[in-house]
């Protein structure tokens, strides 16, 4: 989520990586509260398809709490299609929620994609696709 988060902001990411974004997005740099939407609303547009979100517990720049809050907030869209919402609390480190069509895990560590992350991605897909 961009509003009220710690770590990476629209201003910092558009300054560091302007080529990743359209120029219009830069007008919200340092003014995230004026965005007409937030990231959980974009994630909700994926419903009812599968969606999987991950966090590293020590990745303060990406803000794992905001990533969890975004996943939890977006899960209401999957509820409209009969899925249970994500639980109210994030999973413990090195575990996750895989049974809903929106899944999430939090791994101990920083900004990375590890073998453990890949194993969790595959478990999520195996659960849903057999």
PLM regions: where:
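Mobile cap/lid helix-loop segments that gate and shape the active-site cleft of serine hydrolases
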Residues: 1-42, 67-88
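C-terminal catalytic histidine-bearing segment of alpha/beta-hydrolase fold enzymes
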Residues: 12, 16, 26, 72-130
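Conserved alpha/beta-hydrolase "acid-adjacent" motif
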Residues: 35, 60-70, 114-117
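Short, proline-enriched alpha-helix->beta-strand connector loops that line the catalytic pocket
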Residues: 45-51, 98-102
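Conserved strand-to-loop "acid loop" that flanks and positions the catalytic carboxylate
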Residues: 47-65, 107-110
């Amino acid at each position: 989520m961009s509003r009220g988060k710690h770590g990476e902001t629209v201003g910092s990411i558009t300054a560091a990586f302007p080529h990743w974004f359209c120029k219009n997005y830069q007008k919200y740099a340092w003014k995230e509260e004026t965005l007409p939407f937030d990231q959980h609303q974009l994630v909700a547009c994926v419903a009812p398809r599968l969606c999987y979100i991950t966090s590293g517990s020590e990745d303060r720049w990406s803000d794992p709490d905001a990533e969890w809050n975004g996943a939890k907030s977006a899960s209401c869209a999957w509820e409209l299609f009969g899925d249970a919402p994500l639980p109210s609390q994030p999973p413990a480190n090195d575990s996750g929620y895989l049974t809903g069509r929106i899944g999430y895990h939090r791994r101990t560590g920083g900004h990375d994609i590890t073998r453990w992350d890949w194993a969790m991605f595959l478990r999520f897909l195996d659960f849903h696709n057999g």
